[in-house]
Amino acid sequence: MANKKKPLKKQKIRNSEYYDMQLVLDELYAASVKGQRFCNLVELIKHPENIKLAYRNIRKNSGSRTACVDNKTISDLNKWNENALVAHVQRKLDWYIPNAVRRVEIPKDNGKTRPLGIPTIMDRLIQQCILQVLEPICEAKFFKRSNGFRPNHSAENAIAQAERMIQNVGCHYVIDIDIKSFFDNVNHGKLLKQMWTLGIRDKKLLSIISTMLKAEVAGIGFPEKGTPQGGIISPLLSNIVLNELDWWIVSQWEEMPTQRNYVHRIYANGTPDKSSTIRTLRNYTNLKECYVVRYADDFKIFCKKRSDAVKLFEATKQWLLERLGLETSPEKSKIVNLKRHYSEFLGFKLKVRTKGKKPDGQPRYVIEAHIKDKALLKIRKKSKEIIGQIRQTYDPGMEYRLIQTYNSYVMGVHNYYSIATHVNPDFHKIAFDVKKSLYNRLKHRLQKSGQITNRYIKEKYGTSREVRYLNGHAIVPIAYVQHRVPMDKKSRVNKYTPEGRAEIHKNLAGINMAVLYHLMNNPCGKQSVEYNDNRIALYVAQKGKCAVSGVELEANQVDCHHKKPLVLGGNDSYQNLIIVSDVVHILIHSSNERTIRKYLKVLNPDKKQLAKLNKLRVLAEMPELVF
C-alpha cells in the first residue's frame, strides 16, 4: 500500500467507499443531471454492497436503539450473519410488506404534540437501502435554496440565504405561509407522480414506496395520506413533494426565459452571475420579482414590492391547495413589512433597520437578527432545569456529568444562535436570571478560580471573567457569545461528485462541534471522571480524528482506548489514553482471525497506519498483524 496521506472524509462518504458504492452513486447523480430515466432501481437497491452500506450507516445511529412494535433494535440485527441478513433483505424486497409502525407523540413548545411513526428496525434498514439509491437522483433535481434534510445543507445556510435576499437584493416584504400539518396531509398519489416526473420510472420501486406510505399505524389503522415523521425515507419524500413548489416560484422570476441567451460568468464560489438576466427582467417586463428560501416545510418568499407580495401570497395559497392538496393556516400566514415588523424563521426573528445612506441619498437598510422570544424562554428554562439537577446531587461522578450536560447545552445554543446579529444582547436578557439561579443554588460550592481542562472551552471561554468552577470543573458563562456571519453552502460542495467531495473534505479541518457536544453530554457511565475529562481533551487535541487512520470520527465511532490496559496496570491518565475509531479499537484487542480479516478489509490500512495499529497492539500485549 502507498504511504500517501489519506484526506479527511465524512463518515457516510467513507462508508460508501468501503462498499464500492460511491462510483455507482456518482453515476446515478450524473445521469439524473442529464435527465435520464431510471427503470431498474430495485436491483441496485437489492445489491449486497448497498445492503451492507445501509446496515453500516444505521448501525450506530442513536435511533437504531429505539424499539418498535416488534420490540427489536439494532442489537438484534447485529446477531445476524452478514450473508443471511443480505439474503433476508433481498427476499423482503421481492414482495415487500412492511410491519406496523409504532406511533409516538412528541410534545411541542405550544403544548400540542407531534406524531412520530417509528418503523421496525428491519423496515428502517430497507428504507435506508432505498434512500441511498434515491438520494443522488433527487439531489440532482432539487433547488439550491432548499435546505432541510439534505446532505451538506443546514439551517445556517437558510438564514444566510434569507439575509442575502433582505440586505443585498433589497427584498423587504416577506410572505410567511404556514402549511397545516404538512407531513400528515401529503397526497400519496401526487407524491408517486412527482417521483415519476423526476425520472424514477421503476414501477416496482414505486409500488414498494406506496406500500411503505400505507403501512399500518399500530392502534390507529392504515393511513390514506401523509408521510410518517420518524421514517428514514420520509424527509426525502417530503422534499420531493415541495420541490415542485420551489421550481414553480423560481419559474415566476429567476428562471423566466429571456429572448437573448446571456452567458453568465462564474464566481469564485462556483455560482453563476445572473445580473444581466435579472437586469433585463427588471427593465423590460412587469414580472413580480420574488425569491424563495425553504427549510423542510418552513419557507419564505421575498419580494421588493408590497403589491407583488399580495398577488404572490394569494397565488401561492391557491397553488398549494389546487396542485398539492395542502391547506394553509390563515392565522399564521401573512405578509410582513420588514421595515416595521419581524419575520420569524428557524428560531430567529429578522428585520431591517436604517444605517446611513447610499451614494444616491436613499437610506441604507441592514439586517437585524434576534433570537426568537420563545427560543430565549426555552433556553432560560432548560438552563435553570439543569442547574437544579446539579444542586440536587452530591455524587462527584453525577455532578461531573450534569456539568458537562449544562456546558454542552450552552455551547450548543451559542453555536446555533451566534449567527444572529444581536446574539450577545439577547443572551444578556436571560443571563441575569440564569446566573441568579446558579448563585442561589450553588453559591456555597462555586469558585471563581480554577483550571479549565477542556481545550475547546479554554480557547473559547477562557478569557471570560464570568467562568465559575464547581469542584474544579468549569461552568460555561451563558452570556459570553459573539456574533459570526452565517455562511451559505458553496455551490461546488456535493457528496456525489469527486470535486464536491474534495471541497467537503477541505472544509472539515476544524472540530465537529456536534460530536464534541455529544461526548460532553454522554460520558461513559462506567468510567471515572478523569477518564471522561481526558476523553474530551483528547478528542479536541486530535482534532476529532482517529490516531491511527486520521479519519474524522462521527459521534458513534469515537472510542477512547487505554494504551496500557487497566488489567495490565494501566490508568486513566491523559498520557495512557488515545482516541481511535471503533473499527481500530476492535482490531487492537481482537484475537479472532475472522474478525481481524473482516475489519482489516474495512480499515484498509497503509504501511504507516498498520505500524501505528501494531504499536498499540504490542502495548496491549497482543501479537502484531500482517496485512
Task: Please annotate each region the language model reported.
Residues D178, G550-D582, S590-I596:
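Histidine-centered nuclease catalytic patch
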Residues K214, G219, L324-D395, V410-M411:
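A conserved non-catalytic segment of reverse transcriptases
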Residues R391, M398-Y461:
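Non-catalytic, peripheral interaction segments enriched in hydrophobic/basic residues
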Residues I430-D433, N440-K526:
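Extended C-terminal regions of large enzymes
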Residues L85, L93, A100, K141-R145, ...:
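Conserved polymerase palm-domain catalytic core
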Residues S528-D559, S581-V583:
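Short cysteine-rich loop/turn motifs with clustered Cys
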Residues V567-Q575, L587-F627:
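Polybasic, low-complexity binding patches
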Residues M1-N83:
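Non-catalytic, polymerase-adjacent accessory regions of viral genome-replication enzymes
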